[in-house]
């Protein structure tokens, strides 16, 4: 199976209009997609889309993204933190300095976990990280058994393991988004998986990709759903993180 890219990160919301205003006016880190409607709103980061997913599309109650799930690059972390704090955004403690980067986790609207991030040190190979403000540096994928998770993301999904991964920090790459396998308990957080359909993997043929994953033991309780513009097939990784196969077959309207 070939994952072409991540089409979007699903951000669960209860009130779509309120969430739209929050992402536009409070966070002000991403560009609102002009194709958004009163039923589906998207914000474009530098490398990936964040889709605000109302409860109508995710029955079963509101489940927010867990702690520090969506990690967003900024140039001036202290300045951005001050700006957001003045707008009522709640940060978790004083943030951290890992020795190579600074981070400031915060709780976005509806309890969704996000984090401001700035890497200041070059990578081990000497390369300097370069990306604009608003780039999603990675999505933190909570795991309880890293070896099992590596077998799934590198084996079943066929993603490339980042060669800069270490014994304590492992990343897998799509063409546009990094997935970091993290054990939240090492940061004093409770393990909570990503809610349903949080990461939408673009594939050329949903039915074929689904069949291939089923041979690896992956289950698709909802089968394949036709939304009228795309085919989707929700599934979970071994830790219960909500993922999705996605293929849009309808033409994309011009902006």
Labelled PLM ranges:
Residues 1-18, 68-70, 119-150, 178, ...:
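N-terminal beta-strand motif that seeds the catalytic metal site of vicinal oxygen chelate
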Residues 1-2, 81-132, 138-141, 210, ...:
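Vicinal oxygen chelate
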Residues 42, 103-105, 171, 200, ...:
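Short hydrophobic/aromatic beta-strand element in the GNAT-like acyltransferase core
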Residues 28-35, 90-95, 158-164, 220-224:
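Short secondary-structure junctions
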Residues 30-65, 113-120, 160-194, 242-248:
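Conserved short beta-strand elements that form part of the metal-binding/catalytic scaffold
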Residues 19-26, 84, 111, 149-156, ...:
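Conserved active-site tyrosine of GNAT-family acetyltransferases
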């Amino acid at each position: 199976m070939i994952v072409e890219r991540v089409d979007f990160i699903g951000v669960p919301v209860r009130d779509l209009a309120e969430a739209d205003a929050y992402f536009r006016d409070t966070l002000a880190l991403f560009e609102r997609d002009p194709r958004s409607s009163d039923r589906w709103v998207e914000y474009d980061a530098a490398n990936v889309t964040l889709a605000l997913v109302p409860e109508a599309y995710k029955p079963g109650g509101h489940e927010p993204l867990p702690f520090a799930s969506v990690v967003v690059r900024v140039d001036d972390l202290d300045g951005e933190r001050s700006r957001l704090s003045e707008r009522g955004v709640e940060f978790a403690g004083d943030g951290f300095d890992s020795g190579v980067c600074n981070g400031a986790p915060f709780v976005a609207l509806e309890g969704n976990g996000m984090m401001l991030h700035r890497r200041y040190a070059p990578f081990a190979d000497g390369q300097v990280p370069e990306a604009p403000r608003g780039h999603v540096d990675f999505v933190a994928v909570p795991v309880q058994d890293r070896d099992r998770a590596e077998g799934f993301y590198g084996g079943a999904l066929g993603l490339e393991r980042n060669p800069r991964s270490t014994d304590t920090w492992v990343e897998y790459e799509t063409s546009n988004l990094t997935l970091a396998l993290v054990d939240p308990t090492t940061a004093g957080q409770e393990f909570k998986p990503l809610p349903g359909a949080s990461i939408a993997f673009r594939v050329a043929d949903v039915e074929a990709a689904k069949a291939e994953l089923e041979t690896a033991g992956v289950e698709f309780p909802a089968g394949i759903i036709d939304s009228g513009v795309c085919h989707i097939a929700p599934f979970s990784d071994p830790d219960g993180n909500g993922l999705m196969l996605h293929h849009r077959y309808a033409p994309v309207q011009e902006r």
